[in-house]
Amino acid sequence: QNGNKNSLSKDELAGWKLFSEKLYCIACHTQPYFTTFVAENNGLYASYNGKEDQGRFRIHNDSSDIGKFKVPSLRNVALSFPYMHDGSISSLEDVIEHYSKGGNKHPLQHKNIVEFKISSAEKKQLVSFLKSLTDTSYIQRMNF
């Protein structure tokens, strides 16, 4: 936005407010890259019984790292589906649904992942904001 209040639509601005204040997504998806570059457990699975990728645990063999994966950047998130480390969620709306349920209650999941209520209008606004993080010049490059 760089100080230009007209660069985002009304819905995108409302989505930003949800993202940064009400839902506090910004705790893990901080500016300017919309990531902390830290590994966290986002509650994708209630348990990791060996069938699922156990995340950083595979590297460090530290049980506190079970289910922890690097927090992804949300830049160009509209182009990076399917979502989650294993591609198990196919849409931004479904990602929001996962988080609105407070994840799947893994004992090591990040403390900020808690249940929340969001209306369908608010969900639309949040998705609009997330889509605004798309760099259209990126998709026009030959390498893309």
Please name every model-derived segment.
Residues Q1-S90, D94-P107, R141-F144:
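Short glycine/threonine-rich turn/loop motifs
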